[in-house]
Design a protein with these regions (language model features):
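Outer-membrane beta-barrel proteins and related beta-barrel translocases across Gram-negative bacteria
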Residues: 1-335
């Protein structure tokens, strides 16, 4: 989609989103995208009330980006370059550059040790004229095969090593001391006990979950970040962009009601999930909004209900550990 206008005095703008599918066969996915946002006047959108699919008259930030994505079964490669412009700033500090931004990932499978995911991200970020960060981050994520005991417990391990190499200048959150190398790690053990109750038209699955997680060392201060805890990231090794340090235990449960159909056809009718994080001690480096800075986090959960052929409704929530305050809730429907 593109839109462009021009009036007397060379007041004009151009916005464009272009996508190119570069696939030659079904064994991989390859595409190139281009985003262009330009205007000749900082107040042009507001003065002329420009409102289109691509433009909002209240826009004060422009983004220009070129991105290439490639992926196949066990690997991916993303290469991007971006330039951001803040129209409210009159000096060269209005520009921010992220060039390059390269992400690469590869999965290795072994019968004996499970899977290893290698992910690497290299980027250079320059903003406010003389502030910059150049970094190379490498992650190795280990996921051994799950083990089912005779009593029905499903046990699994998961671990991650992260190597961070960066050089920063005049940034607030990073050390300004030449090239810095850091190593972080985390290991987690999860156990669940799925139980099934069969009925005529429905069957229920109830699964209590337990996870213990430990990450040594010290993490970066994220106290000012806007991060929330939800059930989607409850059992994640790192619930933020950083690996949270310390010892913690996670308790939760999953309950599902599945409707039987003809043959092997079935549909999930209802699902309920709840969970909470118990930290060994308070973590002042975590944002208070996430509740992960406390010994007991919020109780987070998710409820999904399917209305036969009509659609479904999803409800996500977060309740303070004293069960008096509802800190977050979101309702979404799909028809």
């Amino acid at each position: 989609n593109t839109s462009a206008t021009k009036t007397a005095g060379s007041r004009n703008h151009i916005f464009a989103n272009l996508d190119f599918n570069l696939n030659r066969d079904e064994s991989y996915e390859s595409n190139l995208s281009l985003k262009v946002q330009r205007t000749s006047n900082d107040t042009y959108f507001r003065n002329h009330s420009i409102n289109t699919i691509l433009v909002d008259s209240e826009d004060t930030n422009l983004e220009n980006e070129i991105k290439y994505n490639f992926s196949k079964n066990d690997m991916f490669l993303n290469i991007a370059g971006s330039v951001y412009e803040d129209l409210r700033v009159t000096t060269n500090s209005r520009y921010e550059y992220i060039v390059p931004n390269i992400m690469f990932g590869k999965t290795f499978f072994t019968e004996k040790f499970g899977s290893f995911d290698f992910q690497s991200n290299a980027l250079h970020n320059n903003y406010q004229t003389n502030k910059y960060k150049t970094s190379l981050t490498n992650d190795v994520i280990w996921r051994p095969s799950s083990h089912i005991t005779k009593k029905g417990f499903v046990n699994s391990l998961e671990g991650m090593l992260r190597n961070i190499n960066y050089k920063a200048r005049k940034t607030n959150e990073l050390k300004d001391a030449g090239t810095v190398n850091e190593m972080h790690g985390v290991l987690a053990y999860k156990s669940s006990l799925p139980m099934k109750k069969d009925g005529i038209n429905y069957y229920n699955i109830f699964s209590p979950n337990f996870m213990v997680r430990y990450a040594p060392g010290h993490m970066k201060n994220l106290r000012g970040k806007n991060i929330i805890l939800n059930y989607t990231n409850l059992y994640s090794l790192n619930k933020t962009s950083e690996i949270e340090d310390g010892l913690s235990t996670i308790l939760g449960l999953d309950f599902k009601v599945n409707q039987k159909g003809t043959g092997e056809v079935e549909r999930e009718k209802l699902s309920l999930s709840l969970g909470q994080v118990f930290n060994h001690k308070e973590n002042n480096d975590m944002p208070s909004k996430s509740s992960l800075d406390q010994k007991m986090s919020d109780v987070v959960g998710e409820i999904n209900y399917n209305f036969s052929e009509i659609g479904k409704i999803d409800y996500k929530f977060s309740v303070d550990h004293n069960f008096n305050d509802l800190n977050y809730n979101e309702i979404s429907t799909e028809l």
